[in-house]
């Protein structure tokens, strides 16, 4: 049947049924929630049940476990995660039925088309920066729509349909999909060598992709660039778009001065264009989070949020799931009382920043790290950097690599990494073959008063939560 848009009145009524293949992913679930709120009939499938799928089901989405051709019958559009293989039965059925298939980033671009878009890109810090920006704009009364790659703890969700005209979202460079977006403002936090397998193992192509991302801005758009990062600073002088810089450099348009760490918080003076200064207490640890906060402050300033309102939003920020998430204290079977922090960091540069934040906030505690490497290709490409940064902690437990769909690569596993760390002569790492056994090994390593960092982008977060709920016994469900 041929549908007439003028008969339905709007696109939701014309094409009401949208199906998400891989709906439980962080990027997918956020878009699905926004579309549910817009009035679409949302369905989706995923191989795993998680907090995101359960939340969507409660909101009214029809969520199926596993993938089947029958799942897409009757749908008007299929949205697909970049993690889904081309031979997925739902994609094959959609093609045979000539149902439109849209990559996740393309659907995000469609949502952004009906709002004024702010896209946050960068190898590290996207989720925190996007979350802080959403908090600043919300505090400023702008009621933004946001789509974030992690749970904003104050909202209990990673997405929200706001009543205002602005949409702030992460722009994912990992597979180049951020080049589908056409924002009005573009933030670049930093540029690093990661996900090189998607760029022909050529860092120059990564650099070129970020340059092209800025070219997606309209001529009246704005690039917000962290000039503390050398790669981003190099872009600042080349892009033919309006640029506003931020950082701790004296040359930054928006900068932080007199930065000090006070336990889990950072204190600094926020200097805005035209010389306005405001004291800020940021409710996140680490100098890297100060940079993330500066990006959010720059966005707020551009949109007319008052400096004291920006400062209040940063001070009241409740955090994001798995970003230096302080889960509290727990007692081991040997009687040691330890503090547990859960973090998503999985790149050497991220580990270095988190370790610095931990030592700055708790300088008298031993730093014990349980780390689950993520992807064999990243472990191979960043092998020496991983060995160097992991050698700096007081005690280390390594689980096997979380493959994320990759086949094992010889010499890029946790045992090889442990040997390289051991050869540096600074620590004696413990290797656990399966992540499920991690909790029972940790009491042999921990001492009273330790700070335990549970780090990685795989499923180690479930172990951290299991330890808080059940102690160091049993396996996470």
Swiss-Prot record:
> Per the record, a Pfam family?
Mur_ligase_M
- Report the EC code(s) recorded for this entry: 6.3.2.8
Q: What does it catalyze?
A: UDP-N-acetyl-alpha-D-muramate + L-alanine + ATP = UDP-N-acetyl-alpha-D-muramoyl-L-alanine + ADP + phosphate + H(+)
Metabolic or biological pathway, per its Swiss-Prot or TrEMBL entry: Cell wall biogenesis; peptidoglycan biosynthesis
Mainly resides where?
A: cytoplasm
What GO CC annotations are associated with the protein?
Answer: cytoplasm
GO MF annotation terms = ATP binding; UDP-N-acetylmuramate-L-alanine ligase activity
Q: Where in the cell is it found?
A: Cytoplasm
Give me the residues that bind ATP, please: 122-128
Top-rank EC class of the record's enzyme: ligase
Looking up InterPro entries in the UniProt record yields: Mur-like_cat_sf, Mur_ligase_C, Mur_ligase_C_dom_sf, Mur_ligase_cen, Mur_ligase_N, MurCDEF_pg_biosynth, UDP-N-AcMur_Ala_ligase_MurC
Keywords for this protein: ATP-binding, Cell cycle, Cell division, Cell shape, Cell wall biogenesis/degradation, Cytoplasm, Ligase, Nucleotide-binding, Peptidoglycan synthesis
Q: Which domain of life is it from?
A: Bacteria
Under the heading SUPFAM superfamilies, the entry gives: MurCD N-terminal domain, MurD-like peptide ligases, catalytic domain, MurD-like peptide ligases, peptide-binding domain
Biological function: Cell wall formation.
The similarity comment for this entry is: Belongs to the MurCDEF family.
The protein in question is named UDP-N-acetylmuramate--L-alanine ligase
Organism, by scientific name, is: Xanthomonas axonopodis pv. citri (strain 306)
């Amino acid at each position: 049947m041929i549908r007439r848009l003028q008969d339905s009145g709007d696109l939701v009524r014309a094409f009401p049924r949208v199906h998400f293949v891989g709906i439980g992913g962080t990027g997918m679930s956020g878009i699905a929630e926004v579309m549910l709120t817009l009035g679409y009939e949302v369905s989706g499938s995923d191989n795993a049940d998680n907090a995101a799928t359960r939340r969507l089901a409660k909101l009214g989405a029809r969520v199926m476990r596993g993938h089947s051709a029958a799942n897409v019958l009757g749908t008007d559009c299929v949205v697909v995660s970049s993690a889904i293989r081309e031979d997925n039965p739902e994609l094959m059925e959609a093609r045979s039925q000539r149902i439109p298939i849209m990559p996740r980033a393309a659907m995000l671009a469609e949502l952004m088309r009906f709002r004024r878009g702010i896209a946050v890109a960068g190898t590290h810090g996207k989720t925190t920066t996007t979350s802080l920006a959403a908090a600043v704009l919300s505090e400023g009364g702008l009621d933004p729509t946001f789509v974030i790659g992690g749970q904003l703890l104050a909202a209990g969700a990673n997405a929200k349909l706001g009543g205002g005209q602005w949409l702030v979202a992460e722009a994912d460079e990992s597979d180049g999909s951020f080049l589908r977006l056409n924002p009005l403002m573009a933030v670049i936090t930093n540029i690093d060598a990661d996900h090189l397998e998607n760029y022909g193992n050529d860092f120059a192509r990564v650099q070129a992709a970020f340059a092209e991302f800025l070219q997606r801005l309209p001529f009246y758009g704005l690039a917000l660039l962290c000039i503390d990062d050398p790669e981003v600073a190099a872009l600042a002088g080349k892009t033919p778009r309006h640029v506003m810089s931020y950082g701790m450099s004296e040359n930054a348009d928006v900068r932080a001065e007199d930065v000090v760490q006070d336990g889990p918080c950072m204190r600094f003076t926020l200097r805005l264009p035209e010389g306005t200064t405001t004291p800020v207490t940021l409710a996140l640890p680490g100098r890297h989070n100060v940079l993330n906060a500066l990006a959010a402050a720059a966005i707020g300033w551009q949109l007319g949020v008052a400096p004291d309102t920006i400062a209040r939003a940063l001070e009241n920020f409740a955090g994001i799931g798995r970003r230096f998430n302080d889960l509290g204290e727990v007692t081991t079977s040997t009687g040691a009382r330890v503090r547990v922090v859960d973090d998503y960091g999985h790149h050497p540069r991220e580990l270095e920043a988190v370790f610095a934040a931990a030592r700055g906030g708790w300088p008298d505690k031993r730093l014990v790290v349980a780390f689950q490497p993520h992807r064999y290709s990243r472990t191979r490409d960043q092998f020496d950097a991983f060995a160097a940064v992991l050698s700096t902690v007081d005690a280390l437990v390594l689980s096997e690599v979380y493959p994320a769909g990759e086949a094992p690569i010889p010499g890029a596993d946790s045992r090889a990494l442990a040997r390289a760390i051991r050869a540096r002569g600074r620590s004696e790492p413990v290797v656990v073959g399966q992540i499920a056994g991690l909790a029972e090994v940790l009491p042999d390593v921990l001492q009273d008063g330790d700070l335990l960092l549970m780090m990685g982008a795989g499923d180690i977060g479930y172990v951290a939560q299991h330890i808080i709920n059940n102690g160091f016994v049993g396996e996470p469900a």
